[in-house]
Amino acid sequence: MTNIRKSHPLIKIINHSFIDLPTPSNISAWWNFGSLLGVCLALQIITGLFLAMHYTADTTTAFSSVTHICRDVNYGWLIRYAHANGASMFFIFLYFHIGRGIYYGSYNFMETWNIGVILLFLVMATAFMGYVLPWGQMSFWGATVITNLLSAIPYIGPMLVEWIWGGFSVDKATLTRFFAFHFILPFIITAMVMIHLLFLHETGSNNPSGLNSDSDKIPFHPYYTIKDILGVLLMLLTLLSLILFSPDLLGDPDNYSPANPLNTPPHIKPEWYFLFAYAILRSIPNKLGGVLALAFSILILMLFPALHMSKQRSMLFRPVSQCLLWILVANLIILTWIGGQPVEYPFITIGQMASISYFCIILILMPTTSFMENKLLKW
């Protein structure tokens, strides 16, 4: 009799995706982040569902309903902080996952890569709308500032902003629709993840050497399932430490004050994982220019396959390119720091320099370096 996992129509798909999947034998811990992101997504959907059972999407009761979750619901504080800090873990892993893709040239799987960039946009939209829901000061003003950016679009901008708001300012209608979108988007993300995996399994995984690994593959289970479980345990250890010891470390104290349209906080800033893009937005004095730079700072990821000039796929044997990538990482850390600082000298200048160098490294220096490395190797 044929094994059920190889014959059953549904189990067969799972078998080909997670059990008998031929996987390169040399993939490192950098390949763990895909599964970690999957676990994060599941965790966010589960905790989010339990939060939605007690949350009310109304301007008069939203803030107090979150307080009620933390104080009166059994383990409500745990669910709330697991959801908030789970989002931070999600973005840490996302950035590692993208960084791995750039370092090892995984962006040459173009369909997988482009679906991944769309996924990044969807996750960013979901996180932004989720940040608005507790209806604290930073929720309200963050929503006002970020949605207002659309008014920079010529001709239709102001009309578009009022359409998103559902009125003449961020109010009850805005909160209700943001809750609806925040609830539905994770399921759309899950569907996109399946497409992401479908495209990945068409080509098979990349590996650190960047070479074809068809001659040396091993089954995903048990070798990589056990490796992924180790990653998940380390993630849960980190996440639980964060939740139980310093749950508000990555949050903003302003969000513990209820939203007040008459009182603007001294520094309006998004969550830490958006600060690099926020710094790029602020570093351009023109509103439309800033919005375009903000969009392009993420969209630039789609250009990586076109900017790949090297004859080698991976950066493993390209020390100069490696050096440039780590400079880019340092640059992004500087941008993240600047995004959280007030708009004054010297932060404005540092932000502008970091923004220019961000685009220069990706668009000019990395392709030029790859070209030079080819010449040095007489390729």
Swiss-Prot record:
Which GO terms fall under biological process for this protein?
mitochondrial electron transport, ubiquinol to cytochrome c
- Cofactor descriptive note: Binds 2 heme b groups non-covalently.
Record-level GO cellular component terms? mitochondrial inner membrane; respiratory chain complex III
- Give the multimer and partner information: The cytochrome bc1 complex contains 11 subunits: 3 respiratory subunits (MT-CYB, CYC1 and UQCRFS1), 2 core proteins (UQCRC1 and UQCRC2) and 6 low-molecular weight proteins (UQCRH/QCR6, UQCRB/QCR7, UQCRQ/QCR8, UQCR10/QCR9, UQCR11/QCR10 and a cleavage product of UQCRFS1). This cytochrome bc1 complex then forms a dimer.
Q: How does it sit in the membrane?
A: Multi-pass membrane protein
Binding of heme b b566, residues: 97, 196
Any one GO MF term held by the record is:
ubiquinol-cytochrome-c reductase activity
Pfam families in the cross-refs? Cytochrom_B_C, Cytochrome_B
Positions with a binding annotation for heme b b562: 83, 182
Q: What InterPro entries does this protein map onto?
A: Cyt_b/b6_C (IPR005798), Cyt_b/b6_C_sf (IPR036150), Cyt_b/b6_N (IPR005797), Cytb/b6-like_sf (IPR027387), Cytochrome_b (IPR030689), Cytochrome_b_C_euk/bac (IPR048260), Cytochrome_b_N_euk/bac (IPR048259), Di-haem_cyt_TM (IPR016174)
Superkingdom is Eukaryota
Which additional comment does the entry carry? Heme 1 (or BL or b562) is low-potential and absorbs at about 562 nm, and heme 2 (or BH or b566) is high-potential and absorbs at about 566 nm.
Q: Which PANTHER family match?
A: CYTOCHROME B
State the protein's name.
Cytochrome b
Write down the required cofactor(s).
heme b
